């Protein structure tokens, strides 16, 4: 599809474009092509593949938006809420399963759990809860089994203990993506709830990206908490 996102626009600039763009403008063309993509490509994909699903995992990278702004986090939140509208949630009886499939187990997962130390995982999961529940969205999932967790499907770092000035603290060791160097660093604290918008005017988060480590032949792929995800989704079916 021949369209592309308009990045780095503020909310006011976006609204101005929607109000003032002429029918033959680039903005109007992009909007038309995007709507065609939604109605004819995405909708058809959902109808053909997702209508029979009864278990769902929703993944979200809560760390990367923190490196940018509250608006970046809000954009991801809005995208998720739009996604929810395409699925049916609720308890299922036998007839429902046959004629009207619904999601009856739903897990919300914060990714990149290996990019922070283990003591920060509760805060990362808390951000995931805020992402989903803010604005009362949790009401839609009141009748189904839900859970929140944080994982790394491929673990890229190792947690180590560093002694400095007579004090010990947890740190991460891994290959940093930006320079491909092996580093040992403290990644920083994850807020339990999203700071207000003016927080980013004075300071910012800097969560580094890490490369998956090279595996020896026959070595298992390291992960964080993938076993818990499989147990939640499939445990009652085994």
PLM feature spans:
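Switch- and interface-adjacent substructures of P-loop NTPase systems
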Residues: 1-102, 117, 135-136, 152-156, ...
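Short glycine-/polar-rich loops that comprise or flank the Walker A/P-loop
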Residues: 54, 102-105, 143-146
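Short conserved micro-motifs at the rims of enzyme active sites and ligand-binding pockets
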Residues: 69, 119-121, 159-163
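GTPase G-domain guanine-specificity segment
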Residues: 115-140
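Conserved P-loop NTPase catalytic core
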Residues: 134-136, 144-147, 154, 174-175
């Amino acid at each position: 599809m021949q369209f592309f996102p308009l990045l780095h626009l503020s909310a006011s600039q976006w609204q101005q474009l929607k109000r003032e763009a002429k029918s033959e403008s680039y903005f109007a063309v992009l909007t038309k092509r995007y709507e065609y993509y939604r109605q004819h490509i995405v909708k058809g994909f959902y109808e053909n593949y997702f209508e029979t699903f009864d278990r769902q995992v929703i993944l979200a990278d809560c760390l990367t938006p923190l490196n940018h702004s509250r608006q970046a986090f809000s954009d991801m939140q809005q995208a998720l809420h739009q996604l929810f509208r395409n699925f049916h949630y609720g308890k299922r009886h036998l007839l429902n399963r046959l004629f009207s499939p619904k999601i009856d187990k739903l897990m919300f997962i914060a990714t990149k759990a290996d990019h922070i130390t283990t003591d920060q995982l509760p805060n990362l999961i808390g951000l995931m809860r805020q992402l989903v529940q803010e604005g009362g969205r949790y009401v839609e999932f009141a009748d189904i089994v839900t859970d929140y967790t944080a994982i790394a499907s491929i673990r890229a770092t190792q947690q180590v203990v560093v002694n400095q000035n007579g004090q010990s603290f947890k740190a991460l060791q891994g290959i940093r993506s930006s320079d491909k160097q092996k580093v040992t660093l403290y990644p920083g604290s994850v807020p339990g709830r999203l700071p207000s918008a003016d927080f980013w005017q004075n300071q910012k988060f800097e969560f580094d990206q890490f490369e998956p480590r090279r595996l020896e032949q026959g070595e298992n792929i390291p992960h964080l908490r993938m076993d818990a995800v499989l147990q939640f989704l499939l445990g009652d079916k085994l």
